[in-house]
């Protein structure tokens, strides 16, 4: 940030403005609506995308699978990672680890609409030595056996785009 004189049609104001644009990253597909909202604020930002999804097993458990990523260098840049739901925190941590293959950010902001206590604790544990700030709309107390936040809002990707085939 730097102080800069901003001229408007009605006057001049001294304001703090970004020195450089952040990289706005999201987890495909559920994160796209929140990502688009972030781009309304940071309309000159670079974009990063990672596909991280739950691969379910017959025993009811699941692993987080990362199959695709596209990112500019994030070396010494501000990274803003957005995903509407922070349930277990696993996909956010794996996404972060995938992105830092393109450099280490100066600072990371993690933005979620709803998080679980378990997800927040998981981030704190697994991103212990990283510089990050959490921005959360709400923190709910419970995860179901299927790792959905209660009361939460359901599957954010399905709500935005319809059920998966």
Where are these regions (language model features)?
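PRPP-associated nucleotide enzymes
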Residues: 1-165
């Amino acid at each position: 940030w730097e102080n800069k004189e901003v001229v408007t049609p009605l006057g001049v104001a001294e304001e703090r403005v970004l020195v450089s644009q952040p990289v706005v990253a999201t987890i495909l597909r559920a994160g796209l609506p929140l990502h688009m909202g972030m781009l309304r604020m940071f309309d000159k930002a670079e974009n990063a995308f990672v596909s991280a999804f739950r691969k379910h097993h017959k025993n009811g458990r699941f692993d987080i699978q990362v199959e695709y990523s596209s990112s500019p260098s994030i070396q010494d840049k501000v990274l803003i990672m957005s995903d509407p739901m922070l349930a277990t925190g696993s996909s956010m941590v794996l996404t972060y680890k995938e992105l830092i293959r393109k450099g280490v950010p100066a600072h990371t902001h993690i933005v979620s609409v709803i998080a679980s206590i378990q997800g927040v604790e998981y981030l704190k544990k697994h991103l212990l030595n990283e510089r990050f700030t959490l921005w959360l709309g709400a923190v709910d107390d419970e995860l179901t056996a299927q790792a959905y936040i209660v009361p939460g809002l359901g599957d954010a990707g399905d709500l935005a785009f319809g059920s998966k085939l």
